[in-house]
């Protein structure tokens, strides 16, 4: 757990505040079964680099959130590749893990080859707790589709869980962002009917919603609750493309800190990458579906 003393003395003036809880969010690495993403990006290595950057900065997260699209093509080998680096990070930091699958994931294969569980179908909805903080992951993936949905049973289960507040509040994780996007492409593949989720979390102890999917950093609100959309570790989407989806090498991960007084700060941590275009497709392009 983060430094609950909340501050440390400095020679420059007021004490520096320390977080009570730290969450690191890695999203959309799109790890292939072998080789490189788009033939150029070592997506697996970028997850490794993210972990090493945390360690080098002295960041020891309480929770590691993987917010979907862990595999690029839903292959078992991708999860097998990822598992050692994720398990090593959990041991290294003493962190808990929460996974919210994305549209590129196969939930049954993810359960078996990343989490070491039985190959069950159906949504992967989970709850993790650290101290008085509750982190809920809800699975918005729809088999063979790009957009996200939450069914009635999931929303009912979420409402039941939220009926009893957690001492330090709740962070909700869902792969598909429940907020508007600046590009039509991202809007088309976002979470459908976000107002239904808004109705469930309104007035509850949910203090932050974490998402991924769009490969860009953005923020908004849902039912008055802040929403943070994390970047991809594998690529960075161009927010100024009016009619398609263009990605550059780059990306990063997110660090979310919760302080003793309840303040929450989300920070984008960039990974270095060459400024090259990885793909550039339009809404009517036959190559569109494989990349979103």
Which residue ranges define each predicted feature?
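Acidic/histidine-rich helix-loop elements
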Residues: 27-48, 72-74, 106-121, 144-152, ...
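Metal-dependent phosphoesterase/phosphodiesterase active-site architecture
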Residues: 3-8, 226, 231-292
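N-terminal active-site segment of His-dependent metallophosphoesterases
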Residues: 1-81, 181
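Beta-strand-turn-beta hairpins that frame and shape the catalytic cleft
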Residues: 15-24, 127-137, 163-171, 222-227, ...
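Extended active-site neighborhood of metal-dependent phosphoesterases/phosphodiesterases
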Residues: 76-160, 164, 196-202, 223, ...
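His/acidic metal-ligating clusters that form di-metal
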Residues: 50-63, 147-228, 254-255, 262-264, ...
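Active-site environment of divalent metal-dependent phosphoester hydrolases
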Residues: 32-35, 72-75, 81, 103-111, ...
């Amino acid at each position: 757990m983060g430094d609950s003393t909340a501050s440390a003395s400095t020679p420059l003036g007021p004490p520096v505040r320390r977080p009570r809880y730290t969450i690191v969010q890695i999203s959309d690495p799109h790890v292939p079964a072998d080789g490189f993403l788009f033939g150029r990006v070592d997506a697996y290595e970028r997850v490794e680099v993210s972990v090493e950057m945390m360690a080098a900065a002295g960041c020891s997260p309480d929770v590691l959130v993987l917010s979907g699209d862990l595999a690029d093509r839903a292959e078992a080998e991708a999860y097998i590749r990822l598992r050692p680096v994720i398990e090593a990070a959990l041991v290294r930091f003493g962190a808990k893990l929460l996974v919210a699958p994305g549209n590129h994931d196969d939930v049954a294969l993810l359960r078996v080859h990343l989490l070491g569980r039985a190959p069950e179908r159906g949504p992967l909805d989970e709850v993790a707790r650290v101290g008085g903080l509750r982190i809920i992951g809800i699975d918005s993936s729809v088999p063979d589709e790009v957009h996200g949905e939450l069914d009635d049973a999931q929303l009912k289960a979420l409402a039941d869980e939220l009926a009893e507040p957690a001492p330090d509040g709740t962070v909700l994780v869902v792969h598909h962002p429940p907020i508007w996007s600046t590009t039509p492409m991202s809007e088309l593949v976002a979470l459908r009917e976000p107002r239904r989720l808004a109705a469930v979390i309104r007035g509850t102890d949910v203090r932050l919603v974490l998402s991924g999917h769009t490969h860009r950093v953005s923020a908004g609100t849902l039912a008055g609750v802040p929403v943070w959309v994390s970047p991809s570790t594998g690529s960075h989407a161009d927010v100024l493309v009016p009619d398609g989806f263009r990605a550059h090498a780059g990306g990063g991960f997110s660090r979310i800190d919760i302080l003793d007084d309840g303040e929450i700060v989300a920070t984008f941590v960039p990974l270095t990458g060459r400024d090259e275009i990885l793909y550039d497709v339009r809404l009517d392009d036959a190559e569109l579906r494989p990349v979103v």
